[in-house]
């Protein structure tokens, strides 16, 4: 794999680029990346509270001579590296926040951090791999800073807080970074992001053109009927019955109105609130759920059908119903032209056979908001020991990854940067 990468570097674009020098730089950076990852893993911080994480990132970027901006979207850090010649601007993004999860494994760098989250005592853990993303991007920054005389253009390193979502009542994450101008001054031409996966083998890269992760919407339906005695339902209007009919109707949208051979879609109800006593039919009910879509037109269709079902079903049973939809994340939509341009970069690092097309998932990712502004490519990095089919899912207390996969992330981001800026 190294021969493919460095052969391209030597003979494809940079004839004066030293294969042995770059190879040694990767060898030297790997233990640093692993050490950074372990530090962040042992010292995790929740969304919009990544103060010490941001300090360590900023200190490293400043030591490399980068222009550094802190306090972006509360705790974000942005580093700017200007190459030897002017040119295009590329952004590389890593998320830096942890989760309110109590770690259960026996790693020597296991998190022992405790906090109160939503009035509940909990541990704090990097249970989604953001510690690895942060360490990888710090490593990329060091490699590119050492070779900035080979860069034609500018690299913007975006260390983003609150990907998991800001605390209730706060702004944060990618939308706030965009609002504060992270893609401006200089204007970014394209953005790249990665996510490590505990179920993909080390040395593999996984991607999908178009919708790769779902738009996530939260919906609230409020139903109004007429309260009455449970023994005399004919004297009232039962909002629980209306809610049941609406929920049933929502599932018919998926099975009868969406073209599932194109993309997947999901409507799930997660909470229903109604009534006070077993013998009273209540006045109102409320139920809350999520919509997951991978196509913007399908999302529009689903919401329109949900509105129609709410109104018409409630009217048919003598009640009223309202639907409120709140966007949580947009569709993580990989620009097809950009993917086509960058696939050779991935293949040079891990080999064509290890760059694999994946199916879309119905999880969400706020990298999607960057992609709404500029072309972007979001892909997945293997973090499972080869041959070991046992893995622990993300967002669980036992989650862990094989650290030998981190250097692949450093190499891939480095290759993509050189290729994009020198095309």
Locations of the language-model features?
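Soluble non-cytosolic domains of exported or imported proteins
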Residues: 27-31, 44-55, 127, 131, ...
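Divalent metal-coordination and catalytic microenvironments
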Residues: 40, 79, 92, 130, ...
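Metal-dependent amide/peptide-bond hydrolase catalytic core
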Residues: 63, 244-423
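Extracytoplasmic/secreted proteins, especially bacterial periplasmic and envelope-associated proteins
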Residues: 21, 28, 32-35, 39, ...
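Bacterial Sec-dependent N-terminal signal peptides
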Residues: 1-21
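Histidine/acidic-residue-rich, glycine-tolerant segments that coordinate divalent metal ions
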Residues: 114-125, 131-132, 143-144, 149-271, ...
């Amino acid at each position: 794999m190294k021969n493919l990468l460095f052969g391209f570097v030597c003979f494809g674009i940079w004839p004066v680029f030293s294969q042995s020098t770059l190879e040694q730089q990767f060898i030297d950076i790997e233990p640093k990346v692993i050490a950074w990852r372990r530090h962040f893993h042992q010292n995790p911080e929740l969304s919009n509270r990544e103060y010490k994480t941001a300090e360590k990132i900023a200190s490293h970027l400043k030591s490399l001579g980068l222009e550094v901006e802190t306090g972006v979207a509360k705790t974000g850090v942005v580093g700017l590296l200007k190459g030897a010649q002017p040119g295009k601007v590329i952004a590389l993004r890593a998320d830096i926040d942890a989760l309110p999860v109590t770690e259960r494994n026996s790693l020597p760098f296991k998190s022992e951090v405790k906090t109160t989250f939503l009035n509940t005592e909990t541990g704090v853990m990097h249970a989604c791999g953001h510690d690895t993303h942060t360490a990888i991007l710090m490593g990329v920054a060091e490699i590119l800073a050492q070779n900035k005389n080979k860069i034609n253009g500018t690299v913007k390193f975006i260390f983003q807080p609150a990907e998991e979502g800001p605390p209730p009542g706060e702004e944060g994450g990618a939308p706030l970074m965009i609002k504060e101008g992270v893609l401006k001054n200089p204007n970014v031409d394209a953005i790249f992001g990665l996510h490590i996966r505990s179920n993909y083998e080390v040395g593999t890269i996984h991607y999908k053109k178009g919708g790769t992760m779902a738009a996530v919407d939260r919906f609230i339906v409020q139903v109004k009927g007429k309260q009455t005695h449970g023994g005399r339902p004919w004297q009232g209007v039962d909002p629980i019955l209306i809610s049941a009919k609406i929920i049933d109707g929502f599932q018919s949208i998926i099975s009868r109105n969406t073209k599932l051979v194109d993309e997947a879609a999901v409507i799930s109800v997660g909470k229903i609130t109604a009534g006070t006593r077993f013998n009273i039919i209540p006045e109102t009910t409320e139920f809350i759920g999520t919509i997951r879509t991978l196509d913007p037109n399908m999302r529009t269709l689903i919401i329109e059908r949900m509105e129609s079902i709410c109104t018409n079903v409630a009217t048919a049973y003598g009640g009223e119903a309202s639907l409120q939809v709140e966007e949580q994340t947009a569709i993580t939509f990989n620009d097809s032209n950009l993917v086509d341009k960058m696939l050779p970069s991935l293949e040079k690092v891990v080999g064509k056979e290890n760059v694999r097309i994946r199916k879309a998932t119905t999880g969400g990712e706020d990298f999607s908001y960057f992609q709404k502004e500029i072309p972007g490519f979001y892909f997945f990095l293997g973090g499972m020991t080869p041959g070991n089919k046992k893995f622990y899912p993300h967002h669980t207390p036992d989650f862990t990854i094989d650290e030998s996969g981190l250097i692949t992330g450093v190499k891939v981001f480095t290759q993509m940067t050189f290729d994009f800026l020198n095309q």
